[in-house]
Each structure stands twice: as structure tokens, then as C-alpha cells.
Amino acid sequence: MLVVESRNPSRRSVYIWGLITALGVIAGYGAVLLANVRHFYTDDTESQYVPLWVMLGNRLRDGDLPVMVPEHWMAGNYAIEEAGLLNPPQLLIDLIAPSVDNLVLYATVVKLIFAIILGLGVYRICLVYGSRVQWAALAGVSIPFTGWLLFFDEASWMTAFTGTAWMVHAWASGVRYARGNGGPIPVFVYLYLAISVQYIFPAVEAGLMIGAVAIGELVYQRTWRPTLRLLFVSGLAALAGLATYLPSMLSAKVTWRGTAQINNDQFLTVPWSESLNASLPSTLPAFTSWWGYVQPMPVVYIAWFLIPALAFVDWNRARGAWRELTGIAVFALAALMWTAGPGTIGPLRWPARVLPMVALGLLLLVCVLLGRFATFKDWRARGIAAAVLIGLLWIRSFSADPHNWIAHVIAALALAALGAAVVWLAVRKSTTAAVALGIIAVFPIAYIQVERAQPTPMSWNLPSDRAAARAAFPEFAGTTLQLGDRALIPPGERTLDGAYGSLVFGNYAKDIERTYVSGYTPNGHYWFGDMLCMRWDTSVCPDAYRRAFAVEPSTGKTVVDLMNVDRVVLHRALYPDAATQPAPTGWKWVDYPGHEKYIAVLEREDGLISTRNGRISAVENATAVSTSESDTTSKVRVSSDNGGRVVFARLGWPGYRVSLDGKDIPFKVVAKSFVAVDIPAGSTDAELELTWRPPGWKIGGAAIALGLLGLAFFQWLYVRGREPEQDAPAEESIPDGDAELADALR
């Protein structure tokens, strides 16, 4: 017997299925961890984000907002890195991080929390579009285990993941606000959180989402006012988020990302036909990436039921709701088009990164259709149609990856059997039983997919025990410049007992609380990187050693002297004869027993230089004495009879200002990298103050204030409009039960 549930769920059922959604996500994470305990601690998570949390947390505990750390050089401008300095939840993550030694555990717990947030956000969206709670829960449990999210954003690209988690709540709250069932504050807050993760893709995707929702609500409600109201509030959130990106925009000219060109190439552009693989768990799509053409992971997979379930939608009834679902369809279509190119749009590169948006849009569309118009009448004919769809899935997956055709056959047969079981439960028992099986099926599929992808090609295998790593690593005081190449470390030596007991790459130095030049940086500093041929992960070319000790002609000082570097660590695989060569003048070779296999170490003969006279690195025809020093400000007492110059161990980022005895004076950049100030002739004990602030910080602060003022105005309008005499809900308003859920979650 087919049981049809009401579209107006009770508060109790909304909470129960919301809890089921959260528990389902937790169970799914457990399945993934059984396949690979480090799945959520790999690639950029281990090499960029988690070490960054540790460093930022230590500085926040010291009462400092670390917008700039000069000793980190081209990775030290954290106003333009993915630090999330204006994102309160991210700051909380940072604050906790230094207290946790087990980084795998911490990263996994943090990501689990955001996966639950994401799942509940998708659950909310389904409800505001009228889905029954069971199908909404299926969508919520499924979304964290869609291909690209599971294997890239959750495993590696943390800011993309957190931005998506906040964005889906902005979507749900945006629809509620447009339909008069919620206020502007949730829309503003969730959008701001998505924008301020400090990663451009979620910000742009949030804009795409709001545009799609605005179009959808205009089509659905046939009036401009709700849409304009939503667009204004969203614009205010974007205005507040401007402070996050202004420093990057105003610094772009000196970074690797200083182009506004639109180019197309095949790298990580995904043909639309790959979406036909969305329901076959074994699928390995075909497009160009780091690993060639056929991918080693099912990154276009969305959900096992997504395509076959189309056979069980009552399309005659669904056609009557096309206006209400326009927003979801527009979003899914726009995301699908983006994945196919262009390959680069200014700072936006690699269109495959938008695959989670395709998954989100299609999953929402199908689950809302099922949640409102699922039917199991004529189930035999519909079953045949579903079998045909599964056959098409197999054909497309075979076309992309013919060598694994047997795995695709097994997956297709398993999918057919699972679908048949769900249909039987829906016909003989209830929708609840059918959906429960659908949710349970998510877990073994996630396990099999992750286990099948082992060993993951993404892992750096950095040590995850901070205490053990600190104990194993040399006690390097001061500032260290490492010249090495990560590619030269054999896979078997990427362990704490191997190379990682002596070498750092990416942000690993932050895990062990050592001060190293640079770190993981997607932005870089073009001229500094060129000077030392240093790449995004701190790897260098073989010529870096010569360049580091080359004399800068205008100062007569070597590059390492201008940087106030205390130590140079040479990767023996890159410089096998290093220790047999004479040390540069003023330097000496120092033995570190137990580390000779991997590194040769040069230190200054007269001890640490970074602790002397602030960050002054060169003085010409003048005297200069540091009187005060912080990461963003250098105060110096200077004198010069005939005019001179002071050079600082600071990278010449946009945002510096210089004053002499309170009067602004210009500054220069030596070798396109080092900040230098000309001292006027006749200066005697003058106070020189060099200060850095994130460029555009005043505009950004004003934008935040203006955004909040605008929000207050729209909140006043909303409260004023909810007086008791307000009109009854419109005929096509969303179910009351859905509004209750959003009230609880907003």
C-alpha cells in the first residue's frame, strides 16, 4: 500500500528528520574514515589550512590579529591569504587549534561540523520549496558525499567547503525572506559568512545563487518587490564582505594573480556529458587534470538515486510547479554551463571547482520533485524506465573509463537491485522505509568509493602529531630560509622518521612552531618568488642558492642579508655537494646530528641577526636605531648629514606608509622586493615610522558599517510589516511547518 504523507510536517517531524540528517552525516563520515582515517586531512588541508589555524591561533591568543607576518615573506600577507580573518567561526577554529596535538582528529571534527551544517542547510532548502521531510533528509545526508565535495573540498580545499556550508543556509533564508516567512538578518549573516571565508569561489557562487533565487522568486511570485528586497539585503552582505577582498584586489598587481584575462583551456574543464555519470558510484570521469585524462576518483558522482529516480516523478503534476522551482533550475543550469569553461576568468580558474554547485542544484531539484511529486503507480513501467536510465549511466561511464567496465557492470547491477528494494518498500511499506534505505545506502557507497581510490594521489603525508613533530625537528631559532624541492622526496621517505623530521614544505613549519621564509601561498609575491625562484609550496629551483647569496647592487648586500635570515637550510637532494663547498663569507656549516641525510645547514658566524636592531637590514650614509617593532610597524631613530637610506627586511606589499617626525614621506622598493626609505639630508635623531595596513582597510571598514546600517533599515521594515494587521499568507505560500523549521534554524 502506498502511503502519501502531508506536505505540512509537524514541528516534531521537522526536528526528528533534521536530527536524522545530522546523524546520517556522522555515519557517513564514519564510513569514510573506515576506508582512510586521513581522508579529511590531506593535500591542502594538511599543507595549508590546519598549520595556518595553529599559527593564527597562537597569535590570536597573544592578542594579535595577524594581518601581516614579515618573516613569512611572500606567504606572510594574511590579509590576502585564505585566513578568514574577518570570519568569526574561523577565528574560533584558529583559537582552539594550538591546544590540539592530533591534527587529523581536529581537522576531521571541524569538517564533520561543517558537513552537518551543510546537510542541514540542504534540508532547509528542500523544505522551503515544499519537499516532505523524508526526501529533504535524503538530500541533506547525500550532499557531503557527492564526488567533488567528498574528494576535494572536504578532503582538501577547506575554505571552498565552509563557504558552501554557509551558502546553502543563505539560500534557504533567502527564499524565506522573499516569501515573507523570515527576516533579512539570517540572509545577511549567512551570506557574509560565505563571503568572508576569504576564498573567491564561494563568494561568486553565493552571488550566482542569489541571482538564481531572485529570478526564481520573480517568476514564482510575479511581483518585483520581494525580489528587490532580497537583492538589496544580499548587496548589503556583499558590501560588508568587501573588506575581505579589497586587500587582495589592491595587491593583485604584485602577486601571481594579477591578471583579469579570460582564457580557455582544457585543464579541469568538465564536459556536460559527464553529468550522465552522476548516479553510478563506480564512475571515473574523463577530463584533463593533474592525473591525466581519466580521473582516479568519482568526482562527478552526485547520488545513487539521482538519475533513476526521475522515472518515479509524476511529471504531469510537477509541470504545475515549474514556476516555484525556477530558481533551482536556473542555478543548476548556470553551474553546469560554468563547469565546461572558460578555464580562467581572472582569479577564477579550474571550472571543475564548480562541480559541487552542479551537485547541489541537481540534488535539490530531484529531491524536491520527489518530495512533492513522487509516485509509485505503474511501478513496473517506471521500473523499466529506471533500468533504461541505469543503462545510459553504464554506457557513459564505460565510454569515459572502458578499462573498468566490469566494475561499472557490477555498480549498475547493484544500483538496479538497490532501486528495486527502495521501490518495493515504498509500495509495500511506506515512503519513510524507502527513504531510510536510500539514506543507509549512502554509507557503503562512500566507503567503497574512498577505499577504491587508495592510495590517494593527493596526500603529502605530513606528520599529524604536533608534539612528536616538534620533538623530532631541529631547534632552529630565529628565521630560517630553506632551499629545497618537495618533488625530490621519495614517497617512502615522506614520514617523520624520514624527510619530514628535517625539511618543511607548505605551511608545515607552522605546525611545529618554527619561523621559516614563505609557506603555502596561492597568491605569492611575483618579484620575490622570481628573485629566489620560489614556488607556491616553498620549493625552489637549483639556482636558488646562488640567487640567495647574490649581492644586490644598490646596497652591496646579499639577498639573505637584506632578509635578515639567520639560517639557510639546503635540501641535500637538490644540493648534494653543498657541505663540501666553502661556506659563504660570514657563514659556517653547522652539523645537526641525525639530520645529515636530508639537510646541510648554514648559520651566521656571529649569531642571530633577526634579533638585532628590529627589521633594519641595510643602512647607507645614515645611522638608524630601532626603537619599536611590531609586525605592522617599525619605528626607527635616524640621522643623516648628507642624506641616506634605510632598507627594511619587509616585503614591499601595497599598504605601507612612512612618516618622518610626523610628516609623510615616500618610500621605495629595492630589487622590487625590499622596503627602503630615503632619509633627507640634515636629519638628526628624527623619528621614522614605517606602518603597514591592509590596503583599502578604511573603505572596507566603512563598507561594513554601511552594510550593517542598511541591514538595520531592512530589519525595521520587516518588523514593521509583521504587525498583527498584516495580510493573510498568499495562496502559494510555503507550508507552515517549513517556516517553523527555518525559524528554529535561522
Question: Predicted segments — roles?
Answer:
Residues 437-626, 630-631, 663-665:
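Soluble catalytic regions of membrane-associated enzymes that act on cell-envelope
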Residues 26-118, 141-153, 157-164, 268-285, ...:
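Membrane-interface coil-to-helix junctions
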Residues 222-228, 310-334:
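Membrane-interface helix-loop-helix junctions at transmembrane boundaries of multi-pass membrane enzymes
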Residues 49, 613-746:
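Active-site-proximal, structured, solvent-exposed surfaces of multi-pass membrane proteins
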